Every structure is written in C-alpha cells, then in structure tokens.
Design a protein with these regions (language model features):
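Solvent-exposed beta-strand/loop surfaces of large extracellular or lumenal domains
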Residues: 184-206
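Aromatic- and carboxylate-lined catalytic core of secreted/periplasmic carbohydrate-active enzymes
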Residues: 88-133, 225-230
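Generic recognition of flexible, low-complexity loop/linker segments
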Residues: 5-6, 79-80, 87, 138-143, ...
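C-terminal beta-strand-rich structural cap/linker in extracellular carbohydrate-active enzymes
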Residues: 200-231
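Glycan-recognition surfaces
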Residues: 3-109
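Active/binding-pocket-proximal capping segment
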Residues: 106-121, 169-176, 180-192
Length: 231
C-alpha cells in the first residue's frame, strides 16, 4: 500500500496519518500511527464516541484514533460546564489524540485549565473498553483497570436535552454489563469533574448515577485499604 511505501521510505521515526476510517482498511495497520474515525468536523457527537469507543481493542494498541479537531467554544450543552467536560472526557476515553480547532488566543483561562486536567494523555497501549457493549442499545459505560487496586470508570449521557440514569454492576464480566471488580472487596468511588466522593461500595453492588443532560461523569475507583489514600 501507499502507507507501506511511506513507512519504508521515511523510517520508523515518522508518524504517518491515515486520513479517514471511511476509506481506511486494516491493511494499513502497522504502517500508520494514527487514523481519523470521522470526516471533517469540529464538534463531538454520540455517533463519533461510539465509533471510536467500540474499537477500544485497537485504539492505542495498533493505531491512535482521533475524531478530527474539536472546537471547545462549540461544546454542547452550552448552558453548563458539562458540555466542555464531556468533550474533553470522551475525546480522552474513546480516542487517543485531541486536535484543537481553537487557537489558544481564543480560549480563556478556564478553558486552558480544563485542558490541563486531561493532559498528558497516557502513553501505554491500553484504552477504556465499553463495559455495556453487549447489553445496551448504546455504550454509555467505559472502564479501564490501571492497577490491581485502581480503575477508571466513565458514565456518558449522550442525550443533550434530558438527564439519564446509568448503572453498572461493579463485579461481573466486562463488556456484558460488569466492571470486573472483585465481589468480596470494598471500593471508594470519586467523581472527578464534580470533585466529590460518591461513596464506598462493595464489589458485589451496582453503581447507579443520575447524569445531567450531556454529562460525562469521570470516576476513580480505588480498593479500600487500611491506610490513608489519595483518590
């Protein structure tokens, strides 16, 4: 392929970008460093999130996905911070590159601060997987185990007009409605953007949250220890 020729000619220090998944093929994997999962756009939609999210097993492993540039000033819903929080969260969770459509001169201090909350993107070859991929009509829960005692959990309300209850069984099979935690252990769950401790839960319990319209709730899950912990 043309990507093989480019890779061989430019060498292993080059980063080759495959323009668009629409015209892309797995035949280019191993030669391209990144791949677009959507056409030209500067917004984020539920369809974009799902397209990248359901390819979690490839993302950061064999290729880096991006959903084209994102305009922070167009984030929806626009009447709360949930819009930009959602844009940043789901770009991080379901892609592995965030291209800005804005120059820094158009962003205020709060925008720059929020950007700083998600950078740097992690570099290891693993992405959050949709934990409800085979049990719901649309993937709304993403999880990634960072260590044996620390996991990342993301609830995503794709509806920008109405709140929505989202839940996940903390133990159980990942991808089939479970988060894969140990049923006999206790866990602290901390809400990142809302900056609060949600509570302590048994691994055999179900976590249910009511999300505001268009909210992405990013949570840290830590196994309870007998010593003070940073959540």
């Amino acid at each position: 392929t043309i990507f093989k020729l480019a890779s061989e000619g430019l060498g292993n220090k080059a980063y080759i970008h495959e323009r668009n998944l629409k015209y892309g093929s797995d035949i280019a994997l191993g030669y391209v460093a990144s791949q677009r999962t959507w056409g030209d756009t500067d917004v984020i939609t539920p369809e974009m999130v799902a397209r990248s999210g359901l390819r979690w097993y490839k993302n950061r492993v064999v290729v880096n996905y991006d959903m084209d540039a994102k305009n922070l000033l167009k984030a929806q819903p626009a009447d709360s911070e949930d819009g930009i929080n959602k844009l940043l969260t789901m770009s991080y969770v379901t892609a592995s590159r965030l291209l800005l459509a804005n120059s820094f001169g158009t962003l205020d201090a709060e925008h720059v601060y929020k950007l700083s909350r998600i950078y740097p993107f992690h570099q290891f070859a693993r992405s959050a997987r949709p934990l409800d991929a085979f049990t719901t009509d649309y993937p709304r829960v993403y999880g990634m185990k960072l260590t044996d005692k620390w996991s990342s959990l993301t609830f995503f309300n794709e509806d920008e007009e109405h709140p929505q209850k989202i839940s996940i069984k903390l133990s159980g099979i990942e991808g089939r409605g479970g988060a894969g935690l140990h049923p006999d252990k206790q866990y602290y769950i901390y809400d990142f953007w809302n900056d609060k401790l949600i509570g302590t839960f048994g691994g055999n319990e179900t976590l249910e949250q009511e999300l505001r319209k268009g909210e992405a709730r990013q949570m840290a899950v830590r196994e309870v220890e007998s010593n003070p912990q940073v959540l």
